[in-house]
Amino acid sequence: MLRAFAARSCAARGFSRPAAGLLRAPSLRLLSADAQRRGTYEAPTEEKQLAKLQPRIAELYRKGRYKEALAVGEECHALALAAFGKQHPAVASMCNNLALMHKSLGDTDAAAALYKEALDCYRVVVGEEHASTATAACNLALLIRDTDAARLQEAQALLEGALQTRRVLLGEGHLTVAATMGHLASVVKLDGADGRERAKVLLEQALAASTVHWAKPGESAEADLQRASLLHSTGLLHKEAGELSAAEEAWAQAAEIRLGWLGEKHPLSAASQRDLQALREMMGGAE
């Protein structure tokens, strides 16, 4: 998941390490070959303002000041429209960032509309099989998953397409591919017994890839924390199937990883510890 400033998260880039979910705008300039060669390009006023404002959105988002970030994002969106017109990657990036702010503020209807606008724009200007399109599809799919159970098939289709694109662009063993498999598993598991079985396979494949392709445990926070996320999802699947011992094993591993990298006060570490403790109490009561 302002990743178009970036990722995963949420992808295109406005600062070196964008905040999760933020998409940084792609290169904004559309230079003639002659202007590039002679170095005579002068960015329009809107583009200069946009370049200055983008980092501010990320800063406000990281601080949880979503209303202020939304206001700056709306200004950026207007500047991008004025500079490039409606069908441009920079405009799609701004739509993604506005959607994230609305989502953070609890306005999921506005967020869904903006995520859809970003996705439609990317499909037109960069094509279906592009990294930014895959990111936009994931953003919309995850919002649908969390807010509209009647549209789970749509969410699944979006994630299937994003996974296919990312496999081609990044390779089977990439962290982002594994994350997408985890997202897809979280949707397909809701589709009865067959869906749960497919979710299990997806998570097993992602964890197997982590063993072969990723940094060894303890060497990379990014890899380890993605592994912890997959383990937590695996444990939840086992718990829902009544396989409590398997759930405990997966959750214990996830909790240990998160504690080691994030510390006990981090929300993810605390949540893992609470879930694991509650599960063990449940298992004790069942004995």
Residue ranges and their predicted role:
Residues M1-E287:
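Intrinsic-disorder-linked linear interaction elements in eukaryotic regulatory proteins
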